[in-house]
């Protein structure tokens, strides 16, 4: 009997390190706006890691600030920009389990003491730290990754502080790198302009604790737990109240396109968008392809359902509350009928749809973890 010649695996796999430099340069120019593809390329072989720089948009950009007036003057102060992403774990189309796993959180380089550089293709991995469980090493190639914007956190020395922070770049088109930073320090606001590089104390416009700080169309927005909402001009620092005054509300910026107000008693919701010219809220019955994520330690975010495939459990024109005492919930949809009599059944609002059950694994820092069952 003739013996079959054993074929070496190395003879089958191409040696990507031998690719011409000219071709690598052409590839790199097409990856400038596709940062996760650049990460994938870096994981092909060791020589490619020096050819393809790590995407700057995935790095936690930081701004050095003057010594923080409420802390020791010997400690340095930095404001860190944390990119946020929604990870959807890919499952085979014929999988018996029809559920979809999601992780929502910030992304940064692994600087832990036990960090080791992994061989290709595991170099293209994310370590997921869910409280109460062992860290999970998740290959990016097995995930769909959707950017959700970013948040800012204040670092005093090497430790993150629990101060809400908002950052507003000025004159981005003209360059110069000027900015204004606004911090919530419990009893007062602190403001810093890059042109002066000193902290200015700003009296809070509300007696309640601040709920969230964010920016929209070149201005700061501050919401408070008593329902107050103020718009703060970055030049004059004048705070203008934004009506209506409602205890249970969520403000959700959709990039710089729309600002949504979600009013809820958690049984039903009404949604309005801000008409800046008329200075009023206009009620809407359609969110388009948007999925709104409300509450939780990461704040309020949205993603476009156009980027999500059919059958993944999340669809456009829906609201998902990531805050609450129960670990099970359902996406809210507009026009859902209840079991009440027709005369009492007001369908002109968002209600729990009971379509796809959402099971939360973790709601707390640093990552939101949940499963959508279909």
From Swiss-Prot:
Keywords: Kelch repeat, Repeat. The keyword Nucleotide-binding does not apply. Pfam families: Beta-prop_KIB1-4 (PF03478), F-box (PF00646). It comes from the Eukaryota. The keyword Disulfide bond does not apply. Kelch repeats lie at residues 100-150, 249-301. InterPro entries: F-box-like_dom_sf, F-box_dom, KIB1-4_b-propeller, SCF_F-box_domain. Residues 14-63 form the F-box domain. SUPFAM superfamilies: F-box domain. This is F-box/kelch-repeat protein At2g24250. It comes from Arabidopsis thaliana (Mouse-ear cress).
């Amino acid at each position: 009997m003739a013996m079959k010649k054993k074929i070496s695996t190395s003879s089958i796999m191409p040696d990507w390190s031998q690719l011409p430099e000219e071709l690598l340069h052409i590839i790199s120019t097409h990856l400038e706006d596709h940062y996760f593809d650049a990460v994938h390329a870096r994981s092909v072989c060791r020589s490619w890691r020096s050819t393809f720089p790590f995407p700057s948009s995935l790095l936690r950009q930081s701004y050095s600030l003057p010594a923080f007036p409420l802390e020791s003057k010997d400690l340095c102060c930095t404001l860190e920009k944390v990119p946020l992403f929604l990870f959807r774990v890919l499952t085979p189309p014929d999988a018996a389990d029809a559920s979809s796993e999601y992780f929502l959180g910030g992304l940064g380089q692994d600087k832990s003491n036990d960090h080791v550089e992994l061989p290709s293709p595991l170099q293209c991995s994310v370590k997921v730290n869910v409280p109460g469980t062992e860290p999970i090493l998740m290959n990016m190639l097995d995930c769909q990754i959707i950017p959700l914007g970013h948040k800012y956190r204040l670092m005093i020395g090497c430790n993150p502080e629990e101060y809400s922070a908002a950052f507003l770049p000025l004159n981005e088109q003209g360059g110069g790198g000027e900015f204004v930073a606004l911090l919530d320090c419990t009893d007062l606001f602190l403001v810093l302009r890059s042109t002066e590089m000193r902290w200015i104390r700003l009296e809070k416009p509300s007696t309640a604790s601040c709920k969230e700080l964010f920016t929209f169309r070149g201005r700061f927005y501050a919401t408070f737990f008593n329902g107050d909402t103020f718009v703060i001009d970055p030049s004059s620092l004048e705070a203008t109240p934004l009506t209506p005054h409602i205890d249970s509300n969520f403000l959700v910026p959709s990039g710089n396109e729309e600002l949504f107000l979600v009013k809820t008693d958690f049984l039903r919701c009404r949604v309005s968008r801000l008409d800046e010219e008329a200075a009023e809220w206009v009620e809407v019955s359609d969110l388009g392809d948007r999925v709104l994520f409300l509450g939780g330690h990461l704040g309020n975010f949205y993603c476009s359902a156009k980027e999500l495939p059919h059958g993944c459990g999340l669809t456009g024109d829906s609201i998902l509350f990531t805050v609450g005492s129960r670990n099970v919930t359902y996406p809210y949809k507009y026009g859902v009928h209840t079991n009440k009599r027709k005369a009492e059944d007001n369908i002109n609002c968002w209600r729990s749809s009971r379509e796809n059950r959402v099971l939360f694994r973790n709601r707390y820092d640093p990552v939101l973890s949940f499963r959508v069952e279909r």
